[in-house]
Amino acid sequence: KIFKVRKKGAIVSSNTSSIPIKVLSQHLSEEEKKDFCITHFFNPVRYMGLLEIVKNENNDLDKINFLKKFCEIELGKGAIVCNDTPGFLGNRVGVYAMQIAMTEAFKMKLSVEEADAIFGRPMGIPKTGIFGLYDLIGIDLMGDVLKSFIKELPETDKFHEVAKEIPLVKKLIESGFTGRKGKGGFYRVNKTDGKKIMEALNLETGEYSPSKKINIKTEKVDLKSLINRDDKYGKYAWSVISKIIKYASSLVPGITKEFNDI
């Protein structure tokens, strides 16, 4: 409908965060495909600077470059151009980062609270931390996202290594503990003697106990100091960030041609 009323040559874009261009444009003519792309704004749009412009092989590159400059100058966004691949760039790296933060916490036998204290504000991540973020998004929804990536990505992609099913997570979903929208998740609020108590899940036993505040002696972003700590927190931080960097760098030039975009 939009293509019927647009000015000839005008750019038409979708704000989808995951649906491939090849799917959205399957009913467009070859001429219309030249002017169609994806402009993925991250929420909340007012505060998030990142904007992904996803192109396809049919696009007029002059128009894509014009759109990029317009979004940077007029909208004040940090616009990057990427190819039509699963999850585009932001979600591909973001979901991998979440998964590696979770799997490394299991591997290193950290508690939910310890992992969230590190993979949180000290690493420039929202204060929810990794497990709190899982609860916020929905543990079951994240499971569906992982299945989608597993289906779409080639077997050689390192994403498969961090997307393997975790028995405890599977049990949570099956029991209705899907996060904040469910009966709880890695955290839950329990009432005892009329008082609300925040509880955290023990990753080894699967049992809940009162959540503990972990003091790692820093709440500000200080990644350099964090990864150089000679304790389990420093080792966890370095293991997570080094694997994220390694994976992200492997996506050039498949998703984008510039390392700066990553």
Model-derived segments and their meaning:
Residues 1-261:
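N-terminal glycine-rich phosphate-binding loop for ADP-containing cofactors
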